[in-house]
């Protein structure tokens, strides 16, 4: 079983989009060559959580779709992806994931265990859901 772990992409609203596209294309090629079974992005896809540009939405949408076309992709919110000080505000990624409606794209916003298959479970400790942090099950140690 092969997992690809990605984190801290920090896509900027108006800068470096050409460079992001080049890096992402190389990533897609590498993930395809490696034939990964699951992709997990552990947060901070956005660099600025409260002021999202159309360019960010387009680049992020393409990124998510391309990853999910390669393997089931799980996105965990990072502190840059939502507003920790105002929980009534929506995070930057939910509308994008919802609009894509991709069968292999999952946004994990809450803490807890997520079963990938009969063998593997990931334990999410969300910065947006600290009160529900759990330790892995005894059988998983």
Stretch-by-stretch model annotation:
Residues 1-63, 69, 141:
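N-terminal active-site segment of His-dependent metallophosphoesterases
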């Amino acid at each position: 079983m092969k997992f690809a772990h990605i984190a801290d992409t920090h896509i900027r609203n108006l800068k470096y989009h050409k460079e992001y596209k080049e890096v992402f294309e190389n990533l897609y090629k590498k993930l395809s060559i490696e034939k990964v079974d699951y992709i997990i992005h552990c947060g901070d896809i956005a660099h600025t959580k409260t002021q999202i540009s159309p360019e960010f939405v387009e680049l992020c949408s393409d990124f998510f779709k391309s990853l999910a076309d390669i393997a089931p992709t799980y996105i965990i919110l990072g502190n840059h992806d939502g507003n920790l000080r105002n929980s009534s505000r929506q995070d930057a990624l939910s509308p994008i994931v919802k609009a894509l409606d991709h069968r292999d794209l999952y946004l994990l916003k809450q803490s807890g265990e997520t079963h990938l298959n009969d063998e593997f479970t990931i334990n999410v400790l969300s910065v947006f859901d600290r009160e529900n942090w759990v330790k892995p099950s005894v059988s998983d140690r």
